[in-house]
Structures are given as C-alpha cells and as structure tokens.
Regions:
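Bacterial carbohydrate/catabolite-sensing allosteric modules
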Residues: 42, 80-91, 117, 135-142, ...
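Active-site-adjacent beta->alpha loops and helix N-cap segments on the catalytic face
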Residues: 125-135
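N-terminal helix-turn-helix DNA-binding module of bacterial transcription factors
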Residues: 1-59
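Short beta->alpha connector loops
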Residues: 98-101, 121-126, 147, 246
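Amphipathic helical "hinge" segments at domain boundaries
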Residues: 45-107, 114
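Non-catalytic positions within long, well-ordered alpha-helices that form the structural scaffold/packing
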Residues: 105, 111-112, 170-173
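Short gly/ser/thr-rich secondary-structure transition/capping motifs
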Residues: 42-48, 100-102, 121-123, 224, ...
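Phosphate- and divalent-cation-binding pockets in alpha/beta enzyme and binding domains
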Residues: 73-76, 103, 128-129, 195, ...
C-alpha cells in the first residue's frame, strides 16, 4: 500500500508539501500540485481518512442507531447509509438500541464523544438528551421516526400511506378492513392509525384494530397473533393492513394455519414495503417506502451539519411518499 512518503518521492517534493496539497491547508504551486496528484493516481494512494479527520477536528465516524437490525426496513437503510457514507470517507457504526429507552440513552452517551454525527430512529424517550448532544456539536438527524420537531428528520408520509391503502382495498370490495397496529407513542404507527381511522369514518367502515404496546418494530409473531385477534374481533374480516412486512408475513402464516385463502377471502397490504416483500412465496402487496432515497437524504442532511463548521444549518424535515405495488396478496 502506497504511503505519503512514496507520493512525495515520486512527485519530487517533501512530505509536508504533499500533505498541504491533499488537505488544501496551504497554497501549493500549481505545477507541484499537478505532480503530486499524478503521483497519487499512479500509486493508487488512499489518504487515511480517520487521521485526516482528527487533524480537522473530526473523526470521520457516524452512527446509525436503529430500534432493531432484524429483517425490516432498518436493514435496508443501514446498508444504504453505510454504502453512501463510505463514498464520502466516513466509517459507520450500526447500533441496535433494541427499542429500549435506557439502552438507547447509554448508546447515545457513548457515541457523543466518538461520533461526528448520529442518524437515529428513536424511542422518543430521549429527546432532551438528543438535543443536548446536538447542542454540544454532534450532528443529529432523525430517520423514519420524527419524535422531536426540533431535530431535523427524514420520514415518509405515513398518514397518507394508510389512507391510500384503505381506499385501494375499498375499491377491491373490502368492507371489513383490520389493522395490525404498533405502539401509538411511535410516530409512524400513530400517523398510520390516524389515516386508517379517517378513511374508516369517511366510508362508514368498522374499526378493527389489534394493537401492540412495545416500542420496537412489530414482528412475525405479532402478525400471527394479531391476525387471530382481528378475526376474533370481526369474523367477517376481509382485509388486513400490516404496519410492517414481518407482521404481514405473520398474517399470511395465521391465515394458512386457519385454512383461510389469501387473497380470495382476506387480502393483505404491508404499509412499509421492506425488500423482503417481493421474495415471499405469496408476494406481498405493499405501500413501499423509498428506503434507498431516504437513507441517502438522511446522510446528506447529517453531513451538511457535520461539515458546516461554525454555522448551524437550518432545521429541515424531509417527507417522502410511499408507492403502492400490487402483488399476490390483494
């Protein structure tokens, strides 16, 4: 692997001149700079971004704090954030808070001294701590879960997403539409339920709701048990909105166990659209969030704040729309 000394030797100049040219820390004669850049290209020299960041008062390290790293949209987001951060010379820590407020606070307090910035899908229980961390100079961006209006965020329009899904199912002839719900203190779940209730009221449909109090991301067994609960609430159930793909997968399993055909008797739509959906034996219809674009947008916001130096960029809240992709479950 080529070193700074190798570049200096090939460019016929001293190491300090190479360092100034690469860091733009002081003027370098154009001809000398050209020789240095040609030497860098010839040798395939890669600067040590961590060391370079430390000299500039940065560590070139960001963190993504997620409530889970199981099969769900957060898996997609972590891959995208890590890929894009690497292109910009940043290393990424992926942290699983386990959707536990105490564990989340512990992680955040450790990260505030080592990371330049934090992207977080939070529990909503540590908003004051996040504001303190940002006030101390560590950039913070909320992703998926906008739990604090005073911190920049990237989210999807969860309210309109559930409304669109409800209208789609209604046009399919469904009149007893249930929802596998998450914790109402978590913004995406709360907004989806509001959209569901809005359309149910407009169309004079019954509300059939199976809730979940956990702060985490509802999973497979939540879908299995929730579907059975929905059928207990209304045996005429003819459609299910699943807030996550794993809930939807659990719903499919429950219907299979009960001998209920999908989509002939009960249709299912996932309101998240994780990449797992199309891979299922019965491919799932979904309101797909554009996770690659959302991950990149969150990273851009974070890097803007990290690299702003003395000025503080204005607060930004970016909202993406989900798109309906019809598959076999409807």
């Amino acid at each position: 692997m080529a070193t700074l000394k190798d570049v200096a030797k090939l460019a016929n100049c001293d190491i300090s001149t190479v360092s100034r040219a690469l860091n733009n820390s002081a003027p370098v004669h154009p001809e000398t700079r050209a020789r240095i850049m040609e030497a860098v290209k010839t040798l395939g020299y890669k600067p040590n971004m961590v060391a370079r960041g430390l000299k500039m008062g940065r560590r070139n390290l960001i963190a993504f704090v997620s409530p889970t790293i199981r099969l769900n949209i957060f898996s997609d987001l972590s891959v995208e954030i890590q890929r894009e951060a690497e292109k910009q010379g940043y290393q990424t820590l992926i942290i699983n808070s386990k959707a536990d407020a105490v564990n989340e606070a512990k992680c955040l307090n450790e990260l505030r001294s080592i990371a330049d910035g934090i992207i977080i899908a939070s529990t909503g229980r540590n908003n004051r701590l996040l504001r303190e961390i940002e006030g101390d100079g560590t950039a913070v961006v909320q992703l998926i879960r906008k739990q604090d209006e005073n911190i920049s965020s990237v989210i999807s329009n969860y309210y309109d997403t559930s409304k669109e899904a409800m209208h789609f199912l209604y046009k399919k002839g469904c009149r007893h539409i249930g929802i596998l719900h998450g914790n109402e203190n978590v913004k995406p779940f709360a907004d989806r339920l509001k959209g569901y209730r809005k359309v149910a009221k407009e169309l004079h449909l019954p509300e059939i709701i199976s809730g979940n109090d956990a702060l985490g991301v509802p999973g497979f067994m939540d879908g299995v048990n929730g579907t059975k609960h929905l059928l207990e609430l209304d045996p005429a159930l003819d459609a299910i909105l699943a807030e996550t793909d794993l809930q939807g997968l659990g719903a499919l399993r429950a219907l299979k166990e009960l001998g209920i055909p999908c989509p002939e008797q009960i249709k299912i739509i996932s309101l998240t659209g994780f990449s797992l959906g199309p891979m299922l034996e019965t491919a799932m219809t979904s309101m797909a969030m554009p996770s690659p674009e959302m991950g990149r947008a969150a990273l851009r916001l974070l890097l803007d704040r990290i690299e702003a130096k003395d000025r503080r960029p204005p607060l930004q809240h970016i909202v993406f729309n989900a798109s309906l992709t019809e598959r076999e479950t409807t």
